């Protein structure tokens, strides 16, 4: 018809008067391609966008779920066709060969394993993605097919067209790897359930989620592994996907326990006109040794076995960053002596010092107070003001002198600058409140001492 990309609309309409035209909207096109990328997760967890009109799917280890590569390819293209998305697809050992076959080969082409060279040999040179300059020059040299280019000496090809052309050849043939940017982290631990009829009832969603988790957990158990994060994705008829994520404090593969964690989160799934596919992914997969069952039924379970289910429920309800444990850290500076760790992390090498009581609540940064000292130089204040409220000191213990750790890198130079000596006091006011306050600096120096509050005792 004489139409080509980049042609003016007026010229195109002159050639084809009944041509249907629409305004070009790159942002909308990109959003649609990203939505299609998310939709393809039902076929593979590893999906990458290719340019403006293509997708790569790494189907390693997933084609058996459809009964083979051919059935998977037909299902993919037919589903897209039902949604009005015409597509060409192909399968090969390498991304480059699959790209060439999908765009220039026969429809629904599948290159047998290890035979990508023969599969693409008869395709035009444009199938190699060599770039516009090389694609324009090769036909002038009488090179029209991929096989002709493959027959050239590598040195001659690199000299005339650059190393990028040789790299594209190697990527297509599998001699060089091709890095793909997947939309979500690729995971080989993937399984799926498809339904003859869409489902939407809450009890059905809970049941299929449990079934999908049972599938992936059975695979993990068969290979002696467990995982810390799981994701169940509900795929609607209209292409939208609703992921439900759960995490474990310890690696595990108990499908029933995971199903109990998923069930409260199913309220966020909007089934719409129905869910047609459920996929399940496992992340942070590690070896997991089988546990020896105890012969004495009354034996007390370990702390991990007792706490792990509770911690899992709290983490999945409140958020991963809201459930943690405070552990001691080897440091004299109070704000450096406590670190946040996972609730079931191994015990630390450092230990709490019972001879040095520390407040139940330690402030991240000390707060300034206005203090009136009773006696100098080593007595606590008899009155101090904090956050606009006055506190009269009734009892006090101290001082406990702490110096900055000059040997550590990154000592803050803020309100308690390096080299400053701190004298800490445990004080109680006339209402029973107990505070941890300190004096920064010494009397008689260049700068007047300052008073701070650093924590609260129970």
From Swiss-Prot:
Swiss-Prot/TrEMBL induction comment: Up-regulated in response to DNA damage in a RecA-dependent manner.
SUPFAM superfamilies per record: DNA/RNA polymerases
Presence of keyword DNA damage: yes
GO biological process, one term: DNA repair
UniProt keywords, alphabetically: DNA damage, DNA repair
Pfam families for the chain: IMS (PF00817)
CDD domains, alphabetized: PolY_like
Function: Along with DnaE2 and ImuA is required for the error-prone processing of DNA lesions.
UniProt-recorded name of the protein: Protein ImuB
Organism: Caulobacter vibrioides (strain NA1000 / CB15N) (Caulobacter crescentus)
Gene behind the chain: imuB
């Amino acid at each position: 018809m004489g139409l080509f990309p980049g042609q003016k609309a007026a010229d195109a309409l002159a050639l084809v008067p009944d041509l249907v035209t629409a305004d070009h909207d790159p942002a909308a096109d990109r959003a649609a391609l990203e939505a299609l990328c998310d939709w393809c997760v039902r076929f593979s967890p590893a999906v990458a966008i290719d340019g403006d009109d293509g997708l790569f799917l790494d189907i390693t280890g997933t084609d058996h779920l459809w009964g083979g590569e051919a059935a998977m390819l037909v299902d993919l293209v037919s589903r897209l066709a039902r949604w009005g998305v015409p597509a060409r697809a192909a399968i090969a050992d390498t991304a480059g060969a699959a790209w060439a076959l999908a765009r220039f080969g026969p429809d629904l082409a599948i290159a047998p394993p290890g035979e990508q060279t023969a599969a693409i040999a008869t395709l035009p040179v444009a199938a190699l993605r060599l770039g516009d300059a090389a694609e324009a020059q090769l036909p002038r040299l009488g090179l029209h097919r991929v096989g002709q280019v493959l027959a050239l000496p590598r040195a001659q090809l690199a000299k005339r067209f650059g190393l990028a052309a040789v790299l594209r050849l190697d990527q297509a043939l599998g001699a060089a790897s091709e890095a793909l940017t997947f939309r979500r982290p690729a995971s080989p631990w993937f399984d799926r359930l498809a339904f003859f009829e869409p489902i939407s009832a809450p009890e059905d969603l809970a049941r299929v989620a449990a079934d999908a988790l049972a599938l992936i957990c059975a695979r993990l158990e068969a290979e002696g592994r467990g995982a810390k994060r799981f994701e169940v994705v509900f795929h609607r008829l209209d292409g939208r996907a609703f992921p439900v994520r759960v995490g474990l404090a310890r690696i595990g593969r108990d499908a029933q326990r995971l199903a109990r964690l998923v069930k409260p989160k199913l309220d966020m799934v909007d089934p719409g006109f129905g869910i047609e596919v459920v996929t399940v992914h496992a992340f942070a997969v590690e070896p997991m040794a089988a546990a020896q069952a105890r012969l004495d039924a009354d034996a007390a379970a370990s702390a991990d076995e007792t706490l792990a289910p509770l911690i899992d429920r709290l983490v999945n309800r409140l958020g991963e960053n809201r459930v943690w444990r405070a552990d001691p850290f080897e440091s004299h500076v109070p704000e450096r002596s406590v670190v946040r760790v996972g609730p079931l992390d191994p015990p630390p090498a450092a230990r709490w010092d019972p001879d040095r009581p520390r407040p139940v609540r330690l402030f991240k940064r000390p707060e300034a107070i206005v203090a009136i000292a009773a006696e100098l130089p080593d007595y606590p204040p008899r009155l101090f003001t904090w956050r606009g409220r006055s506190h009269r000191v009734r009892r006090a213990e101290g001082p406990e002198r702490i110096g900055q750790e000059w040997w550590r890198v990154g000592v803050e130079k803020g309100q308690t600058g390096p080299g400053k000596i701190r004298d800490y006091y445990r004080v109680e006011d006339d209402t029973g409140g107990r505070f941890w306050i300190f004096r920064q600096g010494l009397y008689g120096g260049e700068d007047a001492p300052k008073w701070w509050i650093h924590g609260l005792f129970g």
